Amino acid sequence: LRPIAPGSGVVGQLARRGHIPLGYYKDPDKSRATFVSLGGVRWALPGDLATVEADGSVQLLGRGSVCINTGGEKVFPEEVESVLKAHPAIFDALVVGVPDARWGERVVAVVQLRAGAALELGAAREFCREQLAAYKLPRELVRVTHLERTAAGKADYRWAKQTALASLAF
């Protein structure tokens, strides 16, 4: 574990200390990977990636396991989702990567619109353009009547990716 210098722009893995569990029940491998000791201090590594801003605040980027690689650039779905969810027509959104012959993956937004709302891809991209780099903008927009979430309320990226692939005829 090495701290990240504030304002450096370096992406690192979030680490937490304090009241940390002893481990996962009957899962020593996962416990070893998640809970580490360094200099007598116990740390938890939940799997989230983050940067430290110049003012010392932490910017959560999301989990590396759902990171989209498009043209060698990393896109964290949660970052794009937070911008999309600010659009007045969007009730909820998940962002996934689908295969792209040129870029490796392309960004797809799976969105649930508010009742009576309409939204086209161009308008969604224009809205996002104010806050996101061009490579992070959704290249496809898949509209659904509701977004699936896990029993714990977490984003179901597997469902969103399958839905996007089916909708885009992959």
Placement of each model-derived feature along the sequence:
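Short, solvent-exposed helix-helix connector turns and helix-capping sites enriched
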Residues: 5-6, 26-27, 156
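AMP-binding/adenylate-forming catalytic core of the ANL superfamily
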Residues: 12, 16-17, 22-26, 33-34, ...
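Acidic/polar alpha-helix N-cap and adjacent early helical turns
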Residues: 162-170
